[in-house]
Amino acid sequence: MTPRHSIAVTVQPSVEPVTLAELKGQCRVEHDADNALLVEWGKAARAMIEEATGRKLLTQTVRVQMADFPANGEPIRLPVWPVQAVTGVTYRRASDGAETALAGTQAWLDHDPPLLAPPVADGSWPFVDERYMNAVTITLVAGGTSAASVPSHAKQAILLAVGYWWGFRGDGRDPAEVQSIPGEAGLPAGCVRLLDLLTQKRYG
């Protein structure tokens, strides 16, 4: 069983699945005064959808941290997908707590879910220093390789979310309040089925 983990995106995607023009069309906005707001909301919607499904829509670097390796040499179930590459595994060595790179791991990236197996040399994970809450760090690159690879229902979910938030905007609200709308309103009910489609078929 894979230990509990934390996930952080350390390098964000360089492009977004939905363009500013598409966002403005969804919200029926013809002026440019709210361009920056709509772009930020598009990013927020993408991030919320990724968090809800575990599916990274576009190329990004992700850090996964755990307190320990799985017992008995079991593989680690990577919590995000699709995974393009595992670029590094480090751990706090049991003997002295020193951060140590682990070589020789086996990544089964086309598995559902993607798995990371221990070094083939002995088939076991090393012992870690239990004083550290995040003794194990896995760095990986995940996501689709281009905006064209993003499923249409993921793009539609982003548009639905931003359009929904736009309806909460109102007139004369404080800019700080407007910025906080995505976190307060969450994803609309119409996104639920679309998110289900994102998780029904992962590979192949």
Language-model features, listed with the residues they occupy:
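Divalent metal-cofactor coordination and adjacent catalytic microenvironments
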Residues: 1-204
